[in-house]
Amino acid sequence: APRDFDAARTVSILVAVSRILPRFDYRIEFAASTDVGLVRPSNEDRILCCPELALFGIADGMGGHAAGEVAAQIAIDTVRDEVLRPPAAAILDAYVADPNIEARREVFALLRRVGEAAHAAILEARRTEPSYQGMGTTLDFVVLAHSRAFFAHAGDSRAYLVRPTTTVQLTQDHALYDTLRAAGTPTPARKPQRNPLVNAIGLAGTVSVDTLFVDLSRGDRILLCTDGVHNAIESEASLSRFCAKGGPQDVAEGLLKHARERGGLDNASVIVIDIMDRFVKRADDAGPSSRDLSVLSACPLLAGMSPAAVLGALAAGVEVELGAGDRIPRDVASDLVAYLVLDGAVDLPDGRRIISSGLLFPESLVGARRKGDLPVAAARTRLIRIRKDDFAEVCEHDAELAAALYQRLARYLALGTG
């Protein structure tokens, strides 16, 4: 039966070795760990590990008088129950049978509905129990299907993708400072010590649930963690070093030990999922479609490079989709970002329109910031988002690839076409 993780003890570990999941092409190995820390009287984090549904999730509750742990538990229980329902199974089965863009959008819509159901359940609990007023929770969960990972996110817990060449922060904290930067609002250069949440499950009348997906390969590692873990990590380079040591259990224990050594100021929880050998082979193997690869190969940053080099560069990228009228942020997950346009169209502030194979914010990849208004998606638009630090990390691992990328980037910026 599906198992959620009892986070009541000081430290707990759940490990499964080389599991086969439904609808997923790879074997996995995973570990989950939680620690109350050295300051908090109780643990308000909750973890969901449900390999029978290819579902993993993490929640960090908030609210006094034990209400935070209630909120986190409600969220985790609701996610599990919603993904268990036949309509969810039908959507995931349809995606695995034919993983086209429309089927992918159906999965995204499902994940948003699941997050919204958790939100509604917490609001209902608050309505019926006065002591629960003010409770809420962060929520991150991932569903593994076909050869991909689908993520849903609300709050400031995080999802990371750790690859041999880079560690990618997939989610953006829904906190005030990060949200203002993403919107292009002038903000201090340094993140303030107080950075309140502006979006989480149960926090307000409505919730916004971010969704994204990544193609997976053997050797990839997925990390879900609460802020008690990521606040204790000095940098993504430091996180990469932690994640390079041993298997999932070693990584989970190492991260919690480090959080305690840094003061144990908060509850700390983590799930580590390793992507192992692939036992299902499909015609539509992992990676960009032939059409998307052709579009990307025509982008100024990647033009003239071999398919292998293009895929190497894309290890730093995450595909995102924006609706018509959405502004395209230049700051995501505490870093400058650039975008490669897969399809759709983007209107720039100067009146120009960028279409497939276009490049947005190329200066971000060398740490420069362009002033002015943000571009806007003119239609539903798919893009590959690349954070500056992730791009630099990929380049550090492959000098030949780095030379090719920076040469193209310098030429593009010198021509003033960015």
Please provide the spans of the model-predicted regions:
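Cyclic nucleotide-binding regulatory domains
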Residues: 324-380, 391
